[in-house]
Amino acid sequence: GDVQEGEFIAEGGGVR
């Protein structure tokens, strides 16, 4: 996603 935690890069970036 954008500024979320727990999502992968394939989700839309924002791995932090």
Curated annotation (Swiss-Prot):
Single biological process term from Gene Ontology: blood coagulation
Cellular compartment(s): Secreted
Record's keyword annotation contains Phosphoprotein: no
Record bears the keyword Disulfide bond: yes
Keywords, sorted A to Z: Adaptive immunity, Blood coagulation, Coiled coil, Disulfide bond, Hemostasis, Immunity, Innate immunity, Secreted
PTM (free text): Conversion of fibrinogen to fibrin is triggered by thrombin, which cleaves fibrinopeptides A and B from alpha and beta chains, and thus exposes the N-terminal polymerization sites responsible for the formation of the soft clot. The soft clot is converted into the hard clot by factor XIIIA which catalyzes the epsilon-(gamma-glutamyl)lysine cross-linking between gamma chains (stronger) and between alpha chains (weaker) of different monomers.
Domain of life: Eukaryota
Signal peptide: none
GO cellular component, one term: extracellular region
Domain notes: A long coiled coil structure formed by 3 polypeptide chains connects the central nodule to the C-terminal domains (distal nodules). The long C-terminal ends of the alpha chains fold back, contributing a fourth strand to the coiled coil structure.
Function: Cleaved by the protease thrombin to yield monomers which, together with fibrinogen beta (FGB) and fibrinogen gamma (FGG), polymerize to form an insoluble fibrin matrix. Fibrin has a major function in hemostasis as one of the primary components of blood clots. In addition, functions during the early stages of wound repair to stabilize the lesion and guide cell migration during re-epithelialization. Was originally thought to be essential for platelet aggregation, based on in vitro studies using anticoagulated blood.
Subunit structure, interactors included: Heterohexamer; disulfide linked. Contains 2 sets of 3 non-identical chains (alpha, beta and gamma). The 2 heterotrimers are in head to head conformation with the N-termini in a small central domain.
UniProt name for this protein: Fibrinogen alpha chain
Taxonomic classification: Eukaryota, Metazoa, Chordata, Craniata, Vertebrata
